[in-house]
Amino acid sequence: MKKIYISLALIFSLNSISAELWTVSELNERISKLKHDLVLLDVRTQAEYASGHILNAINISHEQVLESPELMTVYKDSQMVVFCRSGVRAGKVIQLLESLGFEDIIDIDGDMLAGSEAGYRMEVNDE
């Protein structure tokens, strides 16, 4: 029952996300120009991640983050880019992280779909 309430709260509060919004072009430019590390958090499933992901992105599925938010505490003081395939799962994770006091979160407009459409190359894991 607790998970249902948390899920409903996240769904109804997605409109209040205050994360900074970058385009995929901005992300690509900032990855290549920034001197400090961005935490690139890919919240898709492991199978989606293996089929193609941004170089140096870490994969923690949105389900893992929602069920065990303590996994994210190591990144609390980092600038973090959160993304998924289309933005729905990333939005849920961003909302949760903001409720936990994370302040420097970036959302990607269009997420992985926009990156693919723009022709950005993805790294693929060979299994």
Question: Which positions does each model-derived feature cover?
Answer:
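Sec-dependent N-terminal signal peptides
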Residues: 4-16
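Phosphate-rich cofactor/ligand-interacting catalytic cores and adjacent structured alpha/beta frameworks
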Residues: 42
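Short, surface-exposed ligand- or partner-binding patches at beta-edge/loop junctions that are enriched
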Residues: 83
